[in-house]
């Protein structure tokens, strides 16, 4: 059994905590037992010290223990970014999820409303006509019927509401900002995760490795929480409990360099229209970014043990075919219809 003075004292002294200690702290927070001051102190002290794989794993373990369960058969894929890059870009991961589903992956996307941008994944999906208030059993059925479903984080991790006030009042990013992509409630087997924070990206990769998940964690060298098309990206490739690091250059895949402004988005209605134009066949910088990120997701889903440069070539080709054949557009149409029933 830990205590708050013990946990906070260790963090203030710069000492690392065990997974058991962070799991205890998260249990206090998510049960409503921790005070606002204790939650804020823990969040800031852990962030200031710098998180370890073991510490974040303890937080993740507790979140999973208290999450609303959802059971979806088959090999599952999630594509999500941490946010926080302040790029105000279009919803690349959401579009990539639809394209990956069009290519045959079974996608269970875990996401939330916007925190630091104008439109989060939940916001744009609502604007596209997808209902978010369905029970877990129906969401699982939709995944099987359509090939994609969406788990709204607030519904599947309801105990996180206890951390909402201190997080909002702090007004700065903390470790909590990185937990959503690590806690897909369907326990997706393959994950393509964008992380804007260069310190946290390898930590997130380590958490996936510890859990035995196949994952690609990446960060654009321009700071984007995606595989970027404006320059190169760093990639942490997770398979078999091991993490390897490499780089991705879109030029190697025949993708032209883009200007940063070409990926800038707007509010949910604007970004939903960008999705529709992409699926209708519009070419350009947005399509290139989506093809690259959907290709990465398909690579980790289909070929997790292959070298990234080889798997990415095949993944990008499948992503292009998903768009060009109309398969991705049909996925969205079926998804909207399925959530309306």
UniProtKB/Swiss-Prot annotation:
Pathway in which the depicted protein is active: Amino-acid biosynthesis; L-tryptophan biosynthesis; L-tryptophan from chorismate: step 2/5
Name assigned to this protein: Anthranilate phosphoribosyltransferase
Record-level GO cellular component terms: cytosol
SUPFAM superfamilies, alphabetized: Nucleoside phosphorylase/phosphoribosyltransferase catalytic domain (SSF52418), Nucleoside phosphorylase/phosphoribosyltransferase N-terminal domain (SSF47648)
Its EC number(s): 2.4.2.18
Catalytic activity: N-(5-phospho-beta-D-ribosyl)anthranilate + diphosphate = 5-phospho-alpha-D-ribose 1-diphosphate + anthranilate
Binding site for Mg(2+) 1: 93, 226
Record keywords, A-Z: Amino-acid biosynthesis, Aromatic amino acid biosynthesis, Glycosyltransferase, Magnesium, Metal-binding, Transferase, Tryptophan biosynthesis
Positions of Mg(2+) 2 binding: 225-226
Gene Ontology terms describing biological process: L-tryptophan biosynthetic process
Keyword flag Magnesium: yes
Keyword Zinc attached: no
Segments crossing the lipid bilayer: none
Protein family: Belongs to the anthranilate phosphoribosyltransferase family.
Lineage: Bacteria, Bacillati, Actinomycetota, Actinomycetes, Propionibacteriales
Free-text comment on the cofactor: Binds 2 magnesium ions per monomer.
Cofactor(s) this protein requires: Mg(2+)
GO molecular function, one term: anthranilate phosphoribosyltransferase activity
């Amino acid at each position: 059994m830990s205590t708050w003075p013990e946990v906070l004292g260790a963090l203030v002294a710069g000492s690392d905590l065990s997974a058991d200690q962070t799991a205890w702290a998260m249990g206090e927070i998510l049960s409503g037992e921790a005070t606002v001051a204790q939650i804020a102190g823990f969040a800031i002290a852990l962030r200031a010290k710098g998180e370890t794989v073991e510490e974040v794993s303890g937080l993740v373990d507790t979140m999973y223990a208290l999450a609303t369960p959802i059971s979806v058969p088959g090999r599952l894929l999630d594509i999500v970014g941490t946010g926080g890059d302040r790029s105000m870009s279009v919803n690349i991961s959401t579009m990539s999820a639809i394209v990956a589903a069009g290519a045959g992956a079974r996608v269970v996307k875990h996401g939330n409303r916007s925190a630091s941008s104008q439109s989060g994944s939940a916001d744009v999906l609502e604007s596209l006509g997808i209902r978010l208030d369905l029970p877990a059993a129906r969401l699982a059925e939709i995944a099987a019927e359509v090939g994609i479903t969406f788990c709204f984080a607030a519904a599947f991790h309801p105990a996180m509401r206890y951390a909402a006030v201190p997080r909002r009042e702090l007004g700065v990013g903390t470790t909590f900002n990185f937990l959503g992509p690590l806690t897909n409630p369907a326990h997706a087997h393959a994950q393509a995760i964008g992380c804007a924070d260069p310190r946290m990206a390898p930590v997130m990769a380590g958490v996936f490795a510890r859990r035995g998940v196949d994952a690609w964690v990446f960060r654009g060298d321009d700071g984007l929480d995606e595989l970027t098309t404006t320059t190169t990206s760093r990639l942490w490739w997770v398979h078999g409990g091991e993490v390897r690091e490499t780089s991705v250059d879109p030029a190697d895949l025949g993708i032209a360099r883009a200007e940063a402004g070409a990926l800038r988005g707007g509010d949910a209605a604007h970004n939903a229209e960008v999705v529709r134009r992409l699926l209708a066949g519009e070419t350009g910088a947005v399509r290139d970014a989506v093809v690259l990120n959907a290709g990465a997701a398909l690579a980790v889903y289909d070929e997790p043990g292959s070298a990234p440069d080889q798997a990415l070539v095949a993944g990008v080709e499948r992503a292009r075919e998903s768009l060009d054949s109309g398969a991705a557009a049909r996925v969205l149409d079926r998804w909207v219809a399925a959530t309306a029933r």
